[in-house]
Amino acid sequence: MKKLSLFLLLLGAILPNKQAAAGISGQAATLESQAATPAWQPEQAGSILVSQQAPKHEVRAVWLTTIGGRDWPHSYAQSPISARKQQQELCQILDRLQQAKINTVLLQTRVRGTMIYPSALEPWDGCLSGFPGKSPGYDALQFAIDECHKRGMELHAWVVTIPVGKWDALGCRNLRRKFPKLIRKIGPDGYMNPEDSRTGNYLAQICSEITRRYDIDGIHLDYIRYPENWNLKVSRQQGRNYITSIARKISHAVKSLKPWVKMSCSPVGKYDDLTRYPSYGWNANTKVCQDAQGWLRDGLMDALFPMMYFRNEHFYPFAIDWQEQSHGRIVVPGLGIYFLDPKEGKWNINDVIPEMHLTRNLGMGYCFFRNQFLLNNQQGILDFTRRFNEYPSLVPPMTWASTQKPKQPKALDIKWRNGYMEISWQNEASYTDGTAIPTPHIYNNVYASRTYPVDVNDARNLISARRLGNMLLLKPEECEKPLYFAVTSMDGYGTESLATQEKAADVLLHRHAEGSARMLYCDGKQVHLPEITKNLDTRVFLVETLQGSTVYRATSEGNYINIKPLSPGAYRLYSVNKRGIRHALGTFYKKKFKEN
C-alpha cells in the first residue's frame, strides 16, 4: 500500500491528469501504445519536479559502447598516427561528458568473447584496429582509465557475459575450441551455457584478470541471464540458482582481490510483476532467472543499473520498486534516450525529463543508454543535462563495505601565482586510526564558498570532485568575488575525511591585511572598492598587471573606480596614501564589456 500510494502521488505530480487517472484505473497500456502518449508539460508538474537542488551524492552515468564502434571508436588504429587520432576522439568524448558533469563511464571491455585490452584469455576485438585479433598498438582500457581519472570520473569495465558473438566469429570460435560443448548455438549466435559450471569459473577468471591488472572502479556485468530464446528445461528457481552461482563466483573473485571495486550488473528493467502493474512477460526474475534484487540483499552486487527503457506506468512504479528493494546499495535506472532518435523510437524529450527528476528525488541517479545519443544532443538532451547537473557530484560511498575515514588533508595553502589562484595541500595515506589506506589513490574534493567556514555538505560548494593530485589552479574569472576554500580526502570506497578549512588567521591575513588574495567585483566598467578602503588615507589608486607593471592611475568615485580605459585581463589594485605607502586591496578580472 505504501508503494502504491507513493507511486500515485508521484504519477499525479509528473503526468497530465488524464494519464494519472489511467494509471489509477489500473488499465496499463502496452509498450507499443506508449508512442501516442501526450508529452509531459512542465506547468503540469507538482513541486516534486521543481526547486530541486542537485545532490552532493548522485550517480550520473553513461554506457559507452565499443561493439562495432557504435559510441567509440569511429576510426581504426592501424599506425601510431591513427592510434593517436583514436585516443583523441575518446578524450573529446570524455571532455564533453565532464562538462555535463557525468561522473561514471561504463566502458564496454569484453565485447563478444573479445577484448579491448591485451588479454591472456581472449583475443582483441576488431573495433580498435579493424581486424579481429590484431592489436591497435596501445592498451585501450588502460588509456580510458587514465583519462577518466584525470577528469574525476569513475571507469567501470563493462563485461558482456553469456553472449559470445556470431558462431563463426573469432571470439566464439576461440571459446568453442577452448571449452568443447560449452557454447550453445541459438540462431546465428553463440552463448555460454549458464548451467555449465565452467561458465561461472571462466567469467570469474576474466573479471579477475581485469581487476588484478587495472585500476578500475567497477566491474559491470551485462547479459548475466538466460537468453530469451533459451529452451529452459529446469525450473525457474533452478535457473535462478544457476545464474546466481555465476554472479557469486565473479563477485567473490573480484572482492578477494580489491574489495573497493564495485560489482554491478544491468538487469532487465522490471524485476517482476507488481500488484497493480504487470511486466507483460518481460522481467528479470521470472522470464530470464535474474534475481538481481536478491544479489543486492546477499551482498553479491554493490550496484544495479536496470535497463528501464520505458515510459509512464511502465517506468515509474518499477523505478520505485527497485529503490524500495535496494537494501542500502546503489540502484541507478538506465534511461533509454536512444528512443529520442526518430530512427529508434518516437519518444519526446519530455518523456525523459520527468524520469530524471523522479530518479533524483528517489536518490537513485541515472545512466544514459547510450553515449552517442547524449553527445549528439538528441532533442536537446545534452543541453538539459548540463542545466540539470548544475554542480559536480560524488558517487555515493560504499558504506556497507567500509566506514573508516581518511585523515584530513594538511598544509592547506591559497595564494596567487602567475595569474592563477593556487590551492594546494598535502595528503596522508592513512585512516584516522593509523591504518594504511589500501586503495591505489587518495582522491580530493575541493569546496569553495563566500561564507566561512565552508559548508562541505552543501553540493553548491563542491567545485572539483574526485581530484587526483594535491593542487588546483583557478583562473581569475573563476573567483571574481571573495572565496573561502576547504578540502577533503577520499579513498576508493568513496569515504570522505573531515574537511580541512583555511585557518581563521590566514583568512584574515589574505582577505583583509595583505589583501592580494581578495577578489574584487568588476562589472567591466567599474571596480568596487572593499570596505577596508574607508580606513585608508588614499591619495590615488594604482592598477598593476599580475607581472607588476603599473598600467593605470585613478581616483575613487564613491565606492568604486572607473576602469573603462583598461584592456580585458587580470589586474591588482593598490591604494597609495599621502605618505606614499601602498596597500594591496585585491585582484580583479575585467571582462570585455558590451554596451546595451
Which residues does each predicted region cover?
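Active-site-adjacent "subsite" loops/lids of carbohydrate-active enzymes
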Residues: 56-59, 63-88, 156-213
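Pro/Thr/Ser/Gly-rich low-complexity, intrinsically disordered linker/stalk tracts
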Residues: 383-436, 494-517
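Catalytic domains of carbohydrate-active enzymes, especially glycoside hydrolases
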Residues: 88-114, 214-216
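Substrate-binding cleft of secreted/luminal carbohydrate-active enzymes
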Residues: 292-293, 297-315, 332-402
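Short, surface-exposed loop/turn motifs with a glycine/proline- and acidic-biased composition
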Residues: 479, 555-579
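C-terminal tail/sorting-segment detector
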Residues: 510-514, 528-530, 568-596
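Aromatic-lined carbohydrate-recognition surfaces of secreted/lumenal glycan-active proteins
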Residues: 154-166, 220, 239-285, 331-340
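Beta-strand-rich modules
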Residues: 474-496, 573-575
